[in-house]
Each structure stands twice: as C-alpha cells, then as structure tokens.
Amino acid sequence: MTIHIYNTLTRQKEEFIPLEENKVKMYVCGPTVYNYIHIGNARPPMVFDTVRRYLEYKGYDVQYVSNFTDVDDKLIKAANELGEDVPTIADRFVEAYFEDVTALGCKHATVHPRVTENMDIIIEFIQELVNKGYAYESEGDVYFRTKEFEGYGKLSHQPIADLRHGARIEVGEKKQDPLDFALWKAAKEGEIFWESPWGQGRPGWHIECSAMARKYLGDTIDIHAGGQDLAFPHHENEIAQSEALTGKTFARYWMHNGYININNEKMSKSLGNFILVHDIIKQYDPQLIRFFMLSVHYRHPINFSEELLQSTNNGLERIKTAYGNLKHRMESSTDLTDHNEKWLADLEKFQTAFEEAMNDDFNTANAITELYNVANHANQYLLEEHTSTVVIQAYVKQLETLFDILGLELAQEELLDEEIEALIQKRIEARKNRDFALSDQIRDDLKDRNIILEDTAQGTRWKRG
C-alpha cells in the first residue's frame, strides 16, 4: 500500500515518493515565541507529529525540522510592553511551547533551530540573492525582487497580475514594487539588531525558514508543512527565495492544515476568541484534546465546542474501557477455544483498514473509526464463554500500536480500593438524598473503570470486572 498526499502545489493527491529511499526530509513552520500558544497554534504540531509517526511506523527515517522565530515585530512589541529584553521573552515562551506540545503527545523535532542562532546563514542567503540580482538594498533594508522570479504565485494559484493589483507599499517602505517583500529590515532606534553588509538590522520572517530548511535539510526537501494561513504569503515567498537561489525545487509536497473555529469564526489572537493550550489542559486531559483534533481530517476546519469535546471524550473512554477489560481478562483467560483464527483474521482486517485510511492523505478521522471497530469487536469477543490469551494479547497489542501511531496513550490509572469505597459512600449519600441522577452517574463512571457494583440487602458490594 502506497501513501498518497494532497499537495497544495498541484491541488491533487499524489503518490508519496521521497527523494531518498526510506528517508524523509520534513520541515514544519514553528511558532513565533512571544506568547503562549492557543489550540489553533497547536493543531500543526499535533497533525504533523502524527504524519511523522506514521511515516516512521512505515519504516522511514524522518528528519523533522521545526523552527522557532525568536526575533520579530511581535517579540519586540512584547519586550517594550513588559520592560524585558527579547531573548528573555523568547526563552520563556520556547519553554512554555515545549511544555504544551509535550503534554499534547508531540515528540521533539530532530532539530528545533532558532533564528537568532542561525543569523550567519540567513545573512549569507540574503547576500547570495543580492549577488544574483534577485534582491536589492534600499536605505538599509533589503527586498526580494519578485518580478524576477517567474513562478511567483504558483503555490497559492494566484496570477501575479492579480496579486500586484491587491498589493500596496506601506508608509516607510522603500521597495520598488508592491509585491516585493523584506529580506532584511534596518534597525529602528532601541531595537535589537545584528551587524550585516547593509548595516544594523534583523531578518524578515520569510527568509528565516528558507535559510534554516536549506541548512538542516538541503536544497530540496520532501515535505513542507504548516497552517493554511501560511500558504500565502509565507510559503509562497519561501519558494521564491529558495528556488531563485538554488534553481531547484524547494519542496516536493506542500501540506496545510485547516483552521480551528470558535462559533464558526477562525480562532486568532487578533480576534480575541482564542483558548490557550496551557489553560485548557488544566481542564481537560491533553490526550482528549489530541484525540479530538485527530477526529477530523487535517485539511478540514474544526469547530471547537465543549459539547463536541465531551462527545469525543465518551468515545475515547469506550475504547479505553475495552482496553482495560482486555487487560483484566488476560489473567483469567484459557486457551480452550478453537476459534482463534477467525478473531485474529478480523483483527488483521481492522489493521489493514487503519493503514488504508492513513495512506489516504493521513485520514486520521477514518483511522479512528477503526479504533472504535477494534474496541467493539473486543467487547464482542469478551462475551465468549471461553477466551484465549493469544487473541486477547493480539487485541491489546493492536490497540497499543494504533494509539502509538496517533501519539495517544491507553494506560488508565487503576482506582485504589479506598477511592472506590469513597465513591460508593458518596453514592449511598446521593441515594439517601434521592439524588438518583448523581447515584446513577457514579455507578456508570465506576462501570467505565471496570468496577461492578451490586446492591444487596447487606449493602453495596463491588468487584473488578
């Protein structure tokens, strides 16, 4: 089974054929570290971490690079407002970013380059573009000469005439063409700066990724990915810079994830309708947030609501409960049944269907459907009069493998005896107060944790299922 990826560049699904056999070079645009990330910012790390995990599962050696923009207009503004320097703020939010995405199940990239640690190669990249006539200096700023790059607009599928019609030169800009964009910005008084052939300043946003991708992955990479909002102008400009310099294809497959909406409106810091990751993971299990995100195909928008999150949690708990039941039954199973082959063959079908979903442009939504199928099938098997450790181990291993591919964990902390007794006492009090809704909720919650209650004349008894 081959993997097919929807390529934004061609607007169609294409068979994935890496440049080097069994190796994948992948670059994912990382955050500008001036604040905590919101759940919209967190979608790309989760999506493309899952892509990476699946590629590794299929046997590829993945070189995964994701950068930090640690100097930028937003960082300078934050520094001025807080009375701190830019490096202090950047360091704080790099650490916060790692805490958030690690909680969400994301592995660290092979390399997490920072702009400020790669200034030499960025300046060198700009100088090479100037030398080739693709860039020009203007009063300390350096701009990319867009009209010199023939393919400009090919990623966003916009004719250059249309782009030029909608572009304008802002006050203070010294560029020759409205479509030209900054590679280097002259420092204003009091701003952080680096020395360069054009004077003191700092790089523009777009050049940073081109330079770091080239340094760590080479002139041509397999997959370049990021949020949908980066396709234009950021990724369009990356293509122009990189291909103008090298004369080679910059990235062969372009992947972009959809937005997260709140009440059908794009989540963003500028609109003020965002939910910070470090806040929501205090309220909900981070694994649930990831499961929720992956329940929708990565190219589709997600409309976030607590109702949808709760519904997703119910589904996740069903799978975890099935897994817990399998683990408990493993101790008491025998090998008396002779129907092992049928159940194992069905498991193989679920595995195949899961991989078919992931091979189809990493369709995690359909892949998760197969997780539900495995869990439901396991529950049916556990109703058999005799069960086999061979089959149960196969169910357990399959669920663990598929969850690991998606960056999820199945382990559920077992309730202590004292915790169970405390919940039973709370249920008894609820029944005395005729709060039958609470009583039923406690019973159902315990059942989900594989604790069976039995109400008798002598009181409530319990056992582990």
Swiss-Prot record:
Cross-referenced Pfam families: DALR_2, tRNA-synt_1e
Coarse class of the protein's main subcellular location: cytoplasm
Tree of life domain: Bacteria
PTM annotation (Phosphoserine): residues: 270
GO cellular component entries: cytosol
GO MF annotation list: ATP binding; cysteine-tRNA ligase activity; zinc ion binding
InterPro entries listed in its UniProt record: Cys-tRNA-ligase, Cys-tRNA-synt_Ia_DALR, Cys-tRNA/MSH_ligase, Rossmann-like_a/b/a_fold, tRNA-synt_1_cat_dom, tRNAsynth_Ia_anticodon-bd
Xref: CDD domains: CysRS_core
Required co-factors: Zn(2+)
Catalytic activity as recorded in UniProt: tRNA(Cys) + L-cysteine + ATP = L-cysteinyl-tRNA(Cys) + AMP + diphosphate
Record key words, sorted: Aminoacyl-tRNA synthetase, ATP-binding, Cytoplasm, Ligase, Metal-binding, Nucleotide-binding, Phosphoprotein, Protein biosynthesis, Zinc
Free-text comment on the cofactor: Binds 1 zinc ion per subunit.
Enzyme Commission identifier(s): 6.1.1.16
Localization terms from the record: Cytoplasm
Family that this chain belongs to: Belongs to the class-I aminoacyl-tRNA synthetase family.
HAMAP family on file: Cys_tRNA_synth
Protein name: Cysteine--tRNA ligase
Protein species of origin: Bacillus cereus (strain ATCC 10987 / NRS 248)
